[in-house]
Amino acid sequence: MHPDDAVLDAACGTGRALPVLRAATGPAGLLVGLDLTAEMLAEARRRGRGELARLVRGDVTRLPFADRSFDVVFASGLVSHLPDPDAGLRELARVAVDGARLGLFHPVGRAALARRHGRELTADDVRSEPRIRELLTCTGWQVTRVDDAEDRWLVVAVRRERP
């Protein structure tokens, strides 16, 4: 990230990532935290994170922002909770400028999370590398990094140029 970037924290929840994102953008950068639930945003405000970012209630599949509004899109824990990951990732691409960076994050890797929940890892899991690469490619993103470690799952992508 660069100072002065316009950054969207999609599905920001209580705003846990907002202090780090604000530090990266500096005081002049635009920082927006979006979440579906009023309760999560109220908790973010209670924790003082409304002073760091503009907090907006909204649905990731129908974002209340103009096309090409953000230089960076960050989402922690979002992808596995999207009823239609294709629609959500396509909508994130819509509001991203050409060349924007996308960071998809989860604080636990796939294998560790599967063990924690007593599940088997499957190839059709939305967070599997082949599946997330396919989803992102089909929705306007170019994957530059996939990191699936025990203590994190991180995918970085760049918004492809549009005609």
Q: Residues of each region from the PLM?
A:
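Class I SAM-dependent methyltransferase SAM/SAH-binding core
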Residues: L8-A10, T14-R62
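Short, glycine-/aromatic-enriched active-site segment of Class I SAM-dependent methyltransferases
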Residues: P107-A123
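Conserved beta-strand signature within the Rossmann-like core of class I S-adenosyl-L-methionine
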Residues: G99-H106
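A short acidic, Gly/Pro-enriched loop at the edge of an enzyme's catalytic core
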Residues: T61-V72
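Short alpha-helix
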Residues: D124-T139
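Core SAM-dependent methyltransferase catalytic element
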Residues: T139-W141, D147-P163
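A short glycine-rich, Lys/Arg-flanked "PGG" loop and its adjoining helix->strand segment in the class I
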Residues: D86-D98
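A short SAM/SAH-binding and catalytic strip from SAM-dependent methyltransferases
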Residues: V72-D84
